[in-house]
Amino acid sequence: MIGKLNHVGVATPSIEDSWKLYRDVLGVTDITDKRALPEQGVWVSFVNLPNAQIELIEPLGAASPIHGFLAKNPRGGQHHVCFEVPDILAARDDMRAKGATVLGTGEPRIGAHGVPVIFVHPKDMGGVLVELMATPGEAHRP
């Protein structure tokens, strides 16, 4: 059912500080500008690697869901892993049929890549928050 790993989400209190790590320490040169996703309550920036992306996620506003994560992990850290799926609704239904909890209403919403996404609860995924996203077009490939 799942396709390739698309990205690993990393929560951070400062995307700008995280850029320094990826640029200065790891030598990455392809990093997108920071942009707001108000409907999700986050700022995002993508670190583009040859085979995947790192999604840097910073809270946007007081109601951001990332605040809770950073309260427990003040320096930030791995937030989720994201896999591509060819059919987001079939993937959602398959997760539910297998007893996994799809977060929110279960209706896909548009994610940072401009395609529908869902999140599956970590308690059902070995302790890892899993994002499933509709396979994006070539413009969004690392």
Q: Where do the PLM segments sit?
A:
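Vicinal oxygen chelate
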Residues: 5-13, 45-48, 54-55, 68-142
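Alpha-helix termination/capping residues and helix-transition junctions
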Residues: 2, 25-28, 75, 97, ...
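A short beta-turn/loop motif at secondary-structure boundaries
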Residues: 36-39, 73, 109-112
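Short, structured motif recognition centered on aromatic/hydrophobic residues
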Residues: 5, 12, 19-22, 47, ...
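Long, hydrophobic N-terminal alpha-helical segment
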Residues: 1-40
